[in-house]
Design a protein with these regions (language model features):
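N-terminal secretory signal peptides and thylakoid transit peptides that target proteins
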Residues: 1-20
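Conserved glycine-rich beta-strand-loop-beta hairpin in the small C-terminal domain of fold type I
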Residues: 340-348, 360-389, 424
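PLP-dependent enzyme catalytic core of the Aspartate aminotransferase-like
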Residues: 387-388, 395-453
Length: 453
């Protein structure tokens, strides 16, 4: 695989310090690759294996290879990009391999789309009790294309898009693509948790704000919005004629003890009819390369407006991979949620015991941790650098400099919080969708960096 895309796996492993990682987590001898899937069982003692460190280096991965290209041998572990390091389940791999054995790649027929939509609807009903009409499901190559089509249909260029921040950084690229402007309502952060600033949110629902991008669960803060919160958001949007675009790509990844409320499941029909929902299971099974998502609305008028701007353009293997996940993945997801909940608890306990100066937002969902480095960022010199260079043509934020500093001091790449809008300037996002042994190495390394200032 590596040769076919111009990457040398062993060179990357050596150059990036990945052999040191292998030794640290006990998965291989120095100079050898981490587990690459050959002869490694998918189950251990009847359970799916999330503990084996799976080697992604040399596969063209943004999370690893792109960081190595940027930082060279300074980086040990990529903990920024939001895809998990777990091995793709066998039922997805086998379905794709079976299709690959048919050596023709003609156009996918309409019948396949019908069956695929029915599979998606069954997943929604079985896991969330939500009845979705399969004929209303619009297949897309990702959540972003669906959001961009919707913004173009519902907002005019130069108008504002309402965001509750810190929020998913990808939304800002959607705004650039649609020539719309950000309208950021910063959430309130108190006692390690974020809540909506209701007065500010409503004040921003001005006539030039026609749509709101809602993230549920919220990336990066991990909020899983309650039915009460969603109804209140929906009531305000209905009152001020703002359409809700609900990005629910992380909806399968809710922590134990919490429950997701899909926007389309709200008990107020008028609120639901003022919305579109956007989903995918590419985060759940770490298959974003399959380029597959869907959106829908219970309002045929909104659906028709957006469909004018929408193109499906999906590929056959994407349908095969996602259909296999929907049909066979429930048990795998159930075990994944238990493992991720353990990772969240591990991070919380570790920070409390070893790095109390690092602020921790207790996540209710996603496989992401949102960390506050206020004083540490100041001591690292990142704030001073940002201030000194603020008049540059392309100024960098303090968290941007701090990302570089963290790689230099610890070998761990985290995403800088400035990307996530107002309120994220002194924060970093850490992906914990990895083996717990990798997580321990990363936290130990971050602790060493924190202790150095």
């Amino acid at each position: 695989m590596s040769a076919s895309i111009g990457l040398n796996r062993r060179k990357f492993l050596k150059g990036a310090g990945m052999t040191a990682l292998a030794g640290a987590v006990g998965t291989g001898a120095a100079g050898s690759a981490l587990a690459d899937g050959k002869d490694i069982p998918y189950r251990v003692n009847g359970k799916y294996d999330f503990d084996t460190v799976y080697d992604r280096v040399g596969s063209g991965s943004v999370k690893f290879d792109s960081q190595i290209a940027k930082y060279g041998d300074k980086v040990k572990i990529g903990m920024g990009i939001a895809d998990t390091d777990f091995r793709t389940p066998a039922f997805i791999r086998d379905a794709m391999m079976e299709r690959l054995e048919h050596e023709n790649w003609g156009y996918l027929g309409a019948e396949a789309y019908v069956e695929f939509r029915e599979t998606i609807a069954e997943w929604n009903h079985e896991r969330y009790g939500l009845t979705v009409d399969p004929t209303t499901l619009q297949i897309a190559t990702g959540v972003h294309p669906g959001l961009i089509s919707s913004i173009r249909a519902l907002s005019t260029p130069g108008s504002k898009i309402l965001l509750m921040t810190p929020t998913y950084n990808g939304f800002y690229s959607d705004l650039r693509a649609t020539q719309t402007l950000k309208n950021e309502s910063e959430m309130i952060y108190e006692n390690g948790a974020y809540t909506v600033d209701w007065d500010d949110l409503e004040a921003r629902m001005t006539p030039d704000t026609q749509t709101m991008l809602l993230c549920n669960p919220q990336n990066p803060t991990g909020n899983v919005w309650s039915e009460e919160d969603l109804l209140r958001i929906g009531e305000l949007c209905l009152k001020h004629q703002v359409v809700v675009l609900s990005d629910e790509i992380h909806m399968d990844l809710v922590r134990l003890g919490h429950k997701i409320t899909p926007f389309a499941s709200l008990p107020d029909k008028d609120i639901v009819n003022n919305s579109l929902s956007f989903r995918a299971i590419t985060k759940t099974f770490s298959i974003p390369a399959s380029k597959n998502a869907y959106w829908f609305s219970t309002n045929p008028v909104l659906e028709a407006r957006v469909k004018k701007y929408h193109q499906a353009g999906i590929n056959t293997l994407g349908v095969v991979a996602n259909a296999a996940a929907y049909k066979h993945g429930a048990g795998w997801v159930d075990e994944l949620l238990v493992y991720l909940d353990g990772n969240h608890r591990y991070v919380e306990d570790y920070i409390k015991e070893n790095m109390p100066e690092v602020g921790y937002t207790k996540s209710q969902g996603t496989f992401l941790s949102w960390l506050h480095f206020n004083n540490i960022m100041e001591k690292s010199g990142a704030v001073e650098k940002a201030a000194a260079h603020k008049n540059m043509d392309q100024p960098r934020s303090a968290s941007d400099y701090f990302e570089d500093w963290m790689v230099e001091k610890s070998g761990i790449q985290l995403n800088d919080g400035r990307r996530y809008g107002k309120g994220g300037e002194r924060c970093m996002r850490m992906n914990i969708g990895c083996a717990r042994s990798t997580l321990k190495v990363a936290l130990d390394s971050i602790k060493g960096a924190v202790r150095s200032v």
